Regions:
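Hydrophobic helix-and-loop "lid/oligomerization" segment in the mid-to-C-terminal part
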Residues: 3-5, 9-101
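Secreted, periplasmic, or luminal enzymes acting at the cell surface/secretory milieu
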Residues: 2, 6-22, 88-180
Length: 180
């Protein structure tokens, strides 16, 4: 089931307004999406990766939202900040802007044939996800690999400009969202 059909099943009527594809550099649907978002009470944006972008042999050098999705998210936020962001992805993504601006983020991963139904049940409150992540999300791709049982370095914690330290100079050492 698509996200659209799942929402229709849970609500019992059509509740999905637009499905636009933004996994490329094409911005032709931006204005239509902004128009729909302007008149909506809540905007549910399903962003992330499609199945062929993840899995064995599908490495990416950038963990941001693919294509122009980040730009679309920011444009929609300008006209209606009441957004629920549903992430559909097969790996952790770097989403610092979304974490700072979007009031609700649901990690859906890439589920199966009942994806739409499962996500709709979460969004409409019929199911409460436990909120545990099977993997850590980095703040920035430069933190990778980042994982829950990473050993500490031998570098000292104290910050002294003449001493090496055990953290990054431009971002916190901790993950954006930790494992578990």
């Amino acid at each position: 089931l698509t996200f659209e059909k799942g929402a229709d099943l849970v609500v019992g009527k059509q509740s999905f307004t637009e499905e636009l594809v933004f996994n490329t550099t094409d911005k032709s649907g931006f204005e239509a999406a902004k128009k729909v978002a302007t008149n909506a009470d809540v905007v549910v944006m399903v962003l992330g990766e499609v199945g062929f972008q993840t899995g064995e042999g599908r490495s990416r050098t950038n963990l941001d939202l693919p294509g122009v999705q980040q730009e679309l998210l920011e444009e929609i936020y300008k006209v209606n900040p009441n957004i629920v962001l549903v992430l559909n992805n097969g790996r952790p993504l770097t989403i610092p802007w979304a974490v700072e601006h979007i009031p609700a983020i649901v990690e859906a991963w890439q589920l199966g044939t009942q994806t739409g139904n499962a996500v709709a049940q979460v969004l409409y409150g019929d199911y409460n996800p436990i909120g545990k992540l099977p993997i850590s999300f980095p703040r920035n791709v430069g933190q990778c690999p980042i994982y829950y049982n990473n050993y500490n370095t031998g570098r000292p914690e104290n910050v002294d400009k003449n001493v090496f330290w055990s953290h990054y100079t431009d971002v916190e050492k901790t993950p954006l969202y930790p494992f578990g």
